[in-house]
């Protein structure tokens, strides 16, 4: 089983994502894990009622790990009352679509509760 660790301290977020422009009035968090000797992390922000999936950092492409990172971030947002998730990370479009994100005008989006159910549960 893969364990995903939540990071909310700004100093640790800055170490995980050096050079990322963190805004003062936005709440950031990340999930990170190690799998098969490779490091993976997902940075996201909560801005009002929207969760923005900002950046995924990985040593290699591992769809099951990416899926776990995305689900962890969605769960974090959902538990804090956030209804909508958005993402512009086209490199991970297969994983986003498999979760149930829809694409419009260059952005993937969806309702956090529905996304946590996954596309296999939708009719």
Task: Label every PLM stretch briefly.
Residues 22, 44, 76-78:
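Sterically constrained small-residue positions within well-ordered secondary structures
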Residues 2, 45-47, 86-123:
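Terminal substrate-recognition subdomain of acyl/acetyltransferases
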Residues 51-106:
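Acyl-donor binding region in acyl/amide transferases
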